[in-house]
């Protein structure tokens, strides 16, 4: 079985972070291993506390996984502190498999999840190693200063991200007005990934799910455009199956094929041939 190493924070509510990553990886048919970088106290109403895991513990987890189990791809999420970012850079430098970086720079309420030093190191040392980086609009602004306010700004925002060194950018435009559209580019080719907008507030874990599905397909041998298309379809169906949990925004549902529900209205324009509904 193919392996994906996730380096990210824990979500006590189970909707995002490594919890969402592991559900996604299982649904996509790969084995997920984890390095916990931070523990968060969060639920459907928001993030109520963040505690960084000591960097020695982060390094020990990285060594334990990589020295014995190995990995076919790495996906990073919330890294929090500069020492943790450096530990990840040290561990992934020279690894042969793809690296997916989800910058996870801001909470849903807009609170920063990286220290200023960590953010600088992310720009300077981790992003140049990335096969694909998957920022949302707020993270593009945080990392580059470029504001993406409409679909016409997507190329400019993605171009600014490419200047930081990743090979590909998958810029998530779900918060733009109109039809949700993401832009995948390596600076030479540009592909728009579209899906119908789903009228729901139950979207917790969307970014983690997309990035982990992308990493899973890369680990299974897909090229970046194929993996991005498959990940887009997977997350679109997970959003359509999102469910209420708690008093706020509920999570997306990565394993909805086990729990039938009304189909997604319309069809995602990046269908993966031969895959049944709600599969990865």
Residue ranges of predicted features:
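Charged C-terminal helix
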Residues: 52, 225-280
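Glycine- and other small-residue-rich loops at beta-strand/loop junctions that grip anionic moieties
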Residues: 10, 76-77, 111, 203
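Conserved phosphate/ATP/ADP-binding segment of small-molecule kinases
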Residues: 113-190
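Short, small-residue alpha-helix embedded
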Residues: 19, 24, 141-142, 201-224
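Conserved N-terminal subdomain of the carbohydrate kinase-like
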Residues: 1-6, 18, 22-108
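Short pre-catalytic strand/loop immediately N-terminal to key active-site residues, enriched for Gly-Thr
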Residues: 7-13, 191-204
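Short, charged, surface-exposed loops that flank catalytic or proteolytic processing sites
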Residues: 146-155, 219-229
């Amino acid at each position: 079985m193919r392996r994906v190493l996730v380096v990210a924070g824990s979500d006590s509510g189970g909707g995002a972070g490594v919890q969402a990553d592991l559900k996604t990886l299982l649904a996509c048919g790969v084995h997920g291993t984890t390095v916990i970088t931070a523990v968060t106290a969060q639920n459907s109403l928001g993030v109520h506390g963040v505690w960084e895991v000591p960097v020695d513990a982060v390094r020990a987890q990285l060594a334990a996984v990589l020295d014995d189990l190995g990995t076919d791809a790495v996906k990073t999420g919330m890294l929090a502190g500069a020492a943790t970012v450096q530990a990840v850079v040290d561990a992934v430098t020279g690894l042969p498999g793809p690296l997916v970086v989800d910058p996870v720079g801001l909470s849903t309420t807009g609170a920063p999840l990286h220290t200023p030093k960590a953010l600088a190191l992310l720009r300077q040392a981790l992003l140049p190693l990335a096969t694909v980086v998957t920022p949302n609009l707020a993270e593009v602004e945080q990392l580059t200063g470029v504001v993406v306010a409409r679909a016409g700004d997507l190329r400019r925002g993605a171009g600014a991200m490419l200047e930081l060194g990743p090979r590909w950018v998958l810029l998530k435009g779900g918060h733009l007005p109109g039809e949700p559209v993401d832009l995948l580019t390596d600076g030479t080719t540009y592909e728009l990934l579209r899906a119908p907008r789903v009228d729901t507030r139950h979207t917790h874990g969307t970014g983690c799910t997309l990035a982990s599905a992308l990493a899973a397909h890369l680990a299974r041998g897909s090229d970046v455009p194929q993996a991005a298309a498959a990940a887009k379809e997977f997350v679109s169906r997970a959003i359509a199956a999102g469910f209420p949990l708690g008093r706020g925004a509920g999570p997306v549902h990565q394993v909805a094929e086990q729990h039938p529900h009304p189909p997604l209205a319309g069809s995602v324009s990046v269908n993966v041939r031969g895959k049944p509904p709600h599969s990865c």
